[in-house]
Amino acid sequence: MDDFKITTTHDKRGILLRLSTEITFELNIVKEVNLNDISHSIIFNCFNEYNEIITEIKEKNIPIRIINLKLAKAINIKGTTFGKGSSETYEYIGRGSKWGNPYSMYENGDDRDEVIRKFKYDFDFDKFLNVKKEDFIHLKGKKLGCFCKPQACHGDVIADYLNSLDDGE
């Protein structure tokens, strides 16, 4: 195989770095990819974050493979017009929704970590009264709107679970 180079804007989980020890290639992590320097492109697209660069790549006739990911991600919805309702952009998972954490930091003096730990225990062992663990599948591939982020949130527990599932694709 000829020598090749992989250029990326991030390798947060170190997947490409580990792969580079098994297969010989040059790994470049850059702030911004110069499209004039690439011959082929693979885009892992989630929440349509890369639509603009995909258009640019197609306009330059660079061979491209787009892999659409159905990941869940907890996001902050402070200041949105939808507030405690779902929208096309996100599914509300805070208080008052069936996805909300039944444990509050304001009751019993529990801190954030403790109420998330309690939520995770009930989630892992399917102990909620108003929702079953299997119902959370409905949230796969969605942004999970909450007021906690960027701090730790029960939405992180939900997202981690959903993102660990094999979607068969």
What are these regions, as identified by a protein language model?
Residues 1-26, 33-35, 39, 50, ...:
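Catalytic phosphate/metal-binding cores of nucleic-acid and nucleotide-processing enzymes, i.e., regions
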Residues 44, 63-66:
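Charged, structured surface patches that assemble and position nucleic-acid processing machinery
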